[in-house]
Design a protein with these regions (language model features):
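PRPP-associated nucleotide enzymes
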Residues: 1-321
Length: 321
């Protein structure tokens, strides 16, 4: 049987046994790299591109000359793309070069309010909804021709609406499902409000990069007299939402932890929420200690200021947010 298979192989290939180059799965790229930073993320996109150009020029790789590495080393990896708007305020995505077979990375900052557009004679600031729609327009312009699409979204769109309370929409889950249905394979974000939202797309890639290491490194590099032990420092969660992160910080650094809980007046609604009556503290004394406040998200910042003031009233030494 083995001889017959060998004979068949020789007949098909005219007696020439073709030597196959073994695929190096650790280094071989999925496709030619392409970066599309949307308008609100141009600065970050340019920095990423400059780093990659320099790194690939300096890196040594024995496989660079193979056909699989075609387009590996280039002057730029940024794809020429734009999202112009019509006079009606509507827009369209345009890609001015081929992305067929490319490994595309789309960068979008949905929280960039500095961008504006004109509509009916009025200047409008771009909202997260506008940025998200532009992202979908670029994905639609790709037309399914890319080998793989990865979306890098530093602030996860609709991450505040990650769970349902009553008759509410699950916007974050819907957005993730919509992106993956359009062909997105991976979504990369930073410190998602609730990483469990990835349950909406269990068969696709979802990475939430935690900033804990960078935060601790920044503290140590900039505060010379910082002493990290339970006698000199304490981790504080301003509410129940930041508990998970605060517990992790405290365990990593070997520190005690305290928390505040928001006492609300549920008989009234002000600006769409129940007003906070007081911040009640649970934990040991903070007197004379440096305290680090760890929260999951800052919106207006009012609660963070109130917590910091209360900690100083309790004679905390320094407050780091």
């Amino acid at each position: 049987m083995a001889r017959s298979y060998d004979t068949l192989w020789r007949l098909i290939y005219g007696g020439n046994i073709m030597l196959r180059e073994e695929r190096n799965l650790e280094t071989i790229p999925v496709g030619s790299l392409g970066i599309i930073p949307l308008e609100g993320c141009k600065a970050l996109g340019n920095k990423v591109n400059d780093y990659l150009v320099k790194w690939r020029e300096e890196s040594k790789n024995e496989h660079k000359s193979t056909i699989a590495f075609s387009g590996y080393q280039r002057d730029t990896y940024i794809v020429d793309a734009k999202v112009p708007r019509f006079g009606s305020g509507e827009a369209k995505g345009i890609i001015n070069e081929s992305v067929r077979g490319d490994d595309l990375y789309l960068l979008v900052d949905v929280g960039n309010y500095s961008l504006t557009y004109s509509l009916c004679g009025q200047v409008n600031h771009m909202s997260p909804d506008d940025h998200y729609q532009d992202l979908k327009r670029i994905i639609a312009a790709v037309g399914g021709k890319a080998r793989r699409i990865t979306v890098i979204m530093p602030f996860l769109y609709e991450s505040r609406q990650h769970k349902r309370s009553g008759r509410e929409s699950l916007d974050c889950a819907l957005a993730l499902q919509e992106l993956t249905s359009m062909g997105v394979e991976n979504i990369i974000t930073f410190d998602a409000h609730d990483p469990r939202v990835q349950n909406a797309i269990p068969l696709k890639g979802f990475e939430t990069v935690q900033p804990i290491y960078q935060f601790i490194k920044s503290l140590l590099n900039n505060i010379d007299d910082l002493v990290i032990d339970s006698d000199h420092m304490m981790i504080i969660s301003p509410d129940e939402g930041g508990m998970g992160r605060a517990v992790y910080f405290a365990n990593v650094l070997g520190l005690d932890m305290g928390m505040f809980y928001k006492r609300r007046d549920y008989t009234r609604v002000v600006d769409g929420r129940n007003p906070i009556v007081a911040h009640e503290f649970l934990g040991s004394s903070v007197e004379g200690k440096d305290v680090v406040i760890i929260d999951d998200m800052i919106s207006s910042g009012e609660s963070m200021f109130d917590v910091a003031k209360e900690l100083k009233r309790r004679k905390a030494k320094r407050v780091f947010i």
